[in-house]
Amino acid sequence: MLFISATNTNAGKTTCARLLAQYCNACGVRTILLKPIETGVNDTTNHFSDVHLFLQDNRLLDRSLTLKDISFYRYAKASAPLIAQQEENQNAPIDTNDLIQRLQNFTKTYDLVIVEGAGGLCVPITLEENMLDLALKLKAKILVISHDNLGLINDCLLNDFLLKSHQLDYKIAINLRENNAAFHSVSLPYIELFNERSNNPIVIFQQSLKELMSFALK
C-alpha cells in the first residue's frame, strides 16, 4: 500500500496519484486509487472532484465500483476533516479503525493500493489523530508530493525531517510543471546538493515513475 500526501494543499497529489496508477496499470500492476476522506465537495452539483476522477480511472478495472466504495467520509466544507466533521456531522466522528479495515480489504484484490490523504501529513482527522497517524496505522509506504514553486526547499526539508524522525519508508517527489523554467535556476541547485549528501534523494515526479512504482511494490 502507498499513502500519498503532500507538502501542502494544491501541490498536485491527485494528478500525481492518477499518473502513477496509470503507469502501474500499463505495466500490468493492477492498481486502485482511494481517497477515504474528501472535503470541499458537493456530489450533487460537482462531478469532477478528486474522487470522481479516481472513480473514472478505477472503473477501467471494475465497472461496478461506486463513489462510496472508494471514499467513505465526504464533507462540503473545504477545511481539515476534523473541522468539517464537527460542523456537518458532529455526532459521527471519523473512525480511523474502520477506515483502515476498509482500505486494507482492497489489498486482497489489487496488486497496489494507492491511498490519497487530505492535505499534508499533519492535517487533523480527529482530536487525537492526523494523516500521518493514518499512514502509520496502515503500515503504508509514503510518497510526499511537493509543489515546484519558490519555498519548496523548506517544505521538502520539513517533511523529510518529520518522516526521517519516525524512521519511515518514504519518498519525496516534486511535481514539476512544464512551464516552470524558474525551478531549474532557483530550486534545483539546492535539491542537487541535498541529493549528493542524502541516502533518500528528492526526485522529480515526472522523471521517476518507474522508480516510484518499484518503491511502492518492494
From Swiss-Prot:
Record HAMAP family = BioD
Q: What class of enzyme is it?
A: ligase
Cite the binding residues for Mg(2+). 14, 52, 116
Q: Which catalytic residues are annotated? A: 35
Q: What family classification does the UniProt entry report for this protein?
A: Belongs to the dethiobiotin synthetase family.
Q: Which InterPro entries match?
A: DTB_synth_BioD, P-loop_NTPase
Q: What Pfam families does the entry give?
A: AAA_26 (PF13500)
Its annotated compartments are: Cytoplasm
GO CC terms, sorted: cytosol
Q: What is its EC number?
A: 6.3.3.3
Q: What is its main location?
A: cytoplasm
Q: Give the highest taxon in the source lineage.
A: Bacteria
Sample GO molecular function, one term? magnesium ion binding
- Residues that bind ATP, according to the entry? 10-15, 116-119, 176-177
Enumerate the cofactors the protein uses. Answer: Mg(2+)
User: Lineage in the entry?
Assistant: Bacteria, Pseudomonadati, Campylobacterota, Epsilonproteobacteria, Campylobacterales
Note the coiled coil stretches, chain numbering.
none
Provide the protein name: ATP-dependent dethiobiotin synthetase BioD
Q: Give the UniProt keywords, A-Z.
A: ATP-binding, Biotin biosynthesis, Cytoplasm, Ligase, Magnesium, Metal-binding, Nucleotide-binding
Q: Which transformation does this protein catalyse, written as a reaction?
A: (7R,8S)-7,8-diammoniononanoate + CO2 + ATP = (4R,5S)-dethiobiotin + ADP + phosphate + 3 H(+)
Q: Which residues bind substrate?
A: 39
What is the protein's quaternary organization? Homodimer.
Q: In which pathway does it act?
A: Cofactor biosynthesis; biotin biosynthesis; biotin from 7,8-diaminononanoate: step 1/2
Q: Name one GO biological process term.
A: biotin biosynthetic process
